[in-house]
A protein has these predicted regions:
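A donor-sugar binding/catalytic signature common to diverse glycosyltransferases
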Residues: 1-20, 146-193
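Active-site-proximal region of nucleotide-activated glycan assembly enzymes
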Residues: 3-63
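Short, conserved active-site loop motifs that form the nucleotide-linked donor/cofactor pocket
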Residues: 24, 45, 136-137, 206
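Conserved catalytic-core segment of nucleotide-activated headgroup transferases in glycan assembly
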Residues: 50-144, 152-154
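Short, contiguous acidic/charged loop-to-helix segments that flank catalytic cores in large enzymes
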Residues: 83-88, 112-115, 162-165, 184-189, ...
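Active-site-proximal binding-pocket segments
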Residues: 139, 165-167, 200-203
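Acidic, glycine-centered active-site loop in nucleotide-sugar glycosyltransferases
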Residues: 178, 193-206
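Conserved small/polar residues in nucleotide/adenosyl-binding loops
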Residues: 209-218
Length: 218
């Protein structure tokens, strides 16, 4: 595309627009980019009327996670984040642990990937600095099928999104499983993916632009 193989070129999906000067359009929607975004893009932003992304559902299998197998009481509140480690940062983790601290009978589940040791260390260190026992942090291993992964999301009462790199596929899966989700809305494409998906699903009560609001509501 950099050599202009077509008279009109557009990009879509991915992390954001490419910035390549030979690209004419970047496909977006009313929510995934803020109103003033055109000031910062070399391409013409082409906003579809509702959403830039649509799916027709997901296959879901039988879950292989149970609260009792993880030592979680039946009346506990379970928070879950299914993002990879590179989407975490100290500020997001601090906020997640503050939420956990405000809900005494709660647990935080997170997915284990290749970077799980570093992520576990960050989560445990932050939890301990907030006076939270590491027993309330439970790593969840990878599964063989995406259908099982989606089914396992059902163990959560609330899914906590990451910021400034939101979920995308994981957000769609969460919505498909009808699980409440809390996200923070930023000014960049990657920080507004969950926002546009939730808005298009008619959900507006758990999208925030301010950290304190995110923490207080939860």
């Amino acid at each position: 595309m950099a050599v202009k193989v077509a008279p009109i070129q557009a990009t879509w999906l991915g992390w954001d627009a490419s910035g390549i000067p030979t690209i004419d359009y970047f496909i977006a929607d009313p929510y995934v980019l803020p109103e003033n975004a055109q000031d910062y893009y070399p391409h013409k932003i082409w906003r579809l009327p509702q959403t830039y992304l649509a799916v027709d559902g997901f296959e879901v299998a039988i879950p292989n996670l149970k609260r009792e197998d993880l030592g979680i009481p039946s009346d506990a509140v379970v928070y879950f984040t299914a993002q990879r480690g590179y989407k975490y940062n100290p500020h997001t983790v601090r906020l997640q642990m503050k939420i956990l601290k405000e809900v005494p009978k709660s647990y935080f589940l997170f997915k284990k990937f290749g970077d799980s040791d570093l992520l576990s260390e960050l989560l445990i260190d932050t939890a301990e600095s907030e006076g939270i026992s590491s027993d309330r942090l439970i790593p969840i291993g990878e599964v063989s099928l995406e259908e099982i992964h989606r089914a396992n999301l059902g163990i959560a009462d609330i899914v906590l999104d990451t910021y400034p790199y939101n979920g995308a596929t994981t957000t769609l899966e969460t919505l498909w499983m009808c699980i409440p989700m809390v996200t923070r809305v930023g000014q960049q494409f990657a920080a507004r993916n969950s926002y546009t998906m939730m808005m298009n699903a008619g959900i507006t009560a758990v999208s925030y632009t301010h950290l304190r609001a995110h923490e207080t509501e939860t």
